[in-house]
């Protein structure tokens, strides 16, 4: 479809946008587009992760399973060496700090720095030329607030060269999340603030 083609074009950029919203349309539209997108990306020889939030409904936070899936994919792209294993250990050790509320700020800053530098190194080793596309879907079924929190988490902690996240969300759900979080932002305002590109079902807006 035209919508799929827009996202494929973004993935083909030398410097793909790190966070793309697939916004609007019906749930069926979004599911079909993501399924086509996944097939087309595989056909183009890209690495793709399909992160389906519905599998993690029992988790109180989606960021940690998302990190684990990314690390597993990066590891599998690479013959595991001592250096790779060490980076994976360092990521696993420091990832919980990204959402921790009980660490001292000094400890947290140190661990977040470790997380950031280790994940960047692992990505650089594993993703030589082609980007890794991570599709995040199923947020329609997760607790209210999940879309905003995972989007902000990706923007803050996973903005890494060669990672391209595609997060799918409907208009009504985003409006509900913003209303329930007492945010004064409009859905468009939120998307423009947090995402690097927004793909809708009739046109494309890229800042």
Predicted regions and their residues:
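An amphipathic alpha-helix signature
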Residues: 4, 63-68, 175, 206-207
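P-loop NTPase motor core
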Residues: 42-100, 202-203
């Amino acid at each position: 479809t035209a919508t799929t083609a827009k996202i494929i074009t973004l993935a083909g950029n030398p410097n793909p946008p790190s966070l793309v919203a697939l916004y609007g349309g019906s749930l069926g539209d979004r599911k079909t587009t993501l399924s086509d997108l996944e097939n087309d990306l595989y056909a183009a020889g890209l690495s793709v992760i399909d992160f389906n939030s519905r599998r993690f409904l029992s988790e109180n936070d989606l960021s940690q399973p998302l990190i684990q899936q990314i690390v597993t994919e990066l590891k599998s792209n690479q013959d595991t060496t001592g250096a790779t294993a060490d980076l994976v250990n360092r990521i696993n050790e420091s990832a919980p700090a990204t959402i921790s509320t009980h660490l001292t700020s000094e400890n947290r800053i140190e661990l977040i720095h470790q997380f950031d530098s280790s994940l960047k190194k692992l990505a650089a080793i594993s993703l030589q030329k082609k980007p890794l596309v991570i599709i995040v879907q199923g947020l329609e079924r997760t607790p209210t607030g999940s879309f905003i929190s995972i989007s902000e988490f990706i923007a803050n902690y996973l903005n890494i060269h060669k990672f391209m996240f595609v997060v799918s969300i409907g208009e009504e759900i985003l409006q509900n999340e913003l209303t329930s979080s007492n945010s004064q932002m409009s859905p468009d305002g939120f998307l423009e603030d947090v995402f690097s590109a927004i793909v809708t079902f009739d046109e494309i807006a890229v800042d």
